[in-house]
């Protein structure tokens, strides 16, 4: 299984200070359930836009921990027709492309904290494949109670 991680998830994980205390549990469950943690080329580009060179260097050093997608899925007419009313800022274009990767089946799930992306996922019929950090943890725990470590 392949879990595509939105830029905000990578930032939560690799930040110098904790910004979401559930991020460790998310990565624990991704590992326990043998998900490949993949990132999109657009995520790499976004992380390299940071003006703080020290933060940018930190992210560059940690990106090798993820599998980077080598190509970008073409957006089909069916896909774009479902989203044609969405405003097209640079962030919207990136979000739409990440959703397209799931829509096209190149990733099994997408994990994001972006509410707008989850709304778009509903329009695309892939809401069951787009999770927040806590929603994925809840699903993992409820579907795999035998794997919970109660220590």
Please provide the spans of the model-predicted regions.
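Hydrophobic/aromatic ligand-binding patch that stacks against planar heteroaromatic rings
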Residues: 29, 101, 120
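Alpha-helix capping/helix-boundary segments
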Residues: 9, 43, 97-98, 116-117
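Acidic, PIN/NYN-like endoribonuclease modules and their adjacent C-terminal/linker elements
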Residues: 88, 105, 109, 115-151
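Short, surface-exposed acidic-centric catalytic microdomains
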Residues: 36-39, 43-72
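Short beta-strand scaffold positions
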Residues: 93, 111-112
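Short, well-structured N-terminal submotif of metal-dependent ribonuclease cores
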Residues: 1-39, 50-57
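Short, flexible loop segments at the rims of nucleotide/cofactor-binding pockets, characterized by
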Residues: 14-17, 85-91
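Acidic catalytic patch
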Residues: 64-89
């Amino acid at each position: 299984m392949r879990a595509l991680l939105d830029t905000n998830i990578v930032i939560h994980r690799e930040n110098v200070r904790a910004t979401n205390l559930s991020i460790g549990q998310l990565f624990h469950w991704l590992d326990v359930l043998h998900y490949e943690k993949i990132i999109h080329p657009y995520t790499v580009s976004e992380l390299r836009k940071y003006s703080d060179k020290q933060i940018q260097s930190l992210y560059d050093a940690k990106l090798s921990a993820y599998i980077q997608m080598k190509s970008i899925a073409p957006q089909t007419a069916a896909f774009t027709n479902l989203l044609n009313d969405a405003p097209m800022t640079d962030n919207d274009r990136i979000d739409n492309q990440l959703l397209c990767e799931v829509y096209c089946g190149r990733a099994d799930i997408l994990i994001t904290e972006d509410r707008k992306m989850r709304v778009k996922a509903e329009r695309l019929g892939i809401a069951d494949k787009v999770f927040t950090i806590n929603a994925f943890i809840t699903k993992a725990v409820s579907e795999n109670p035998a794997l919970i470590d109660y220590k």
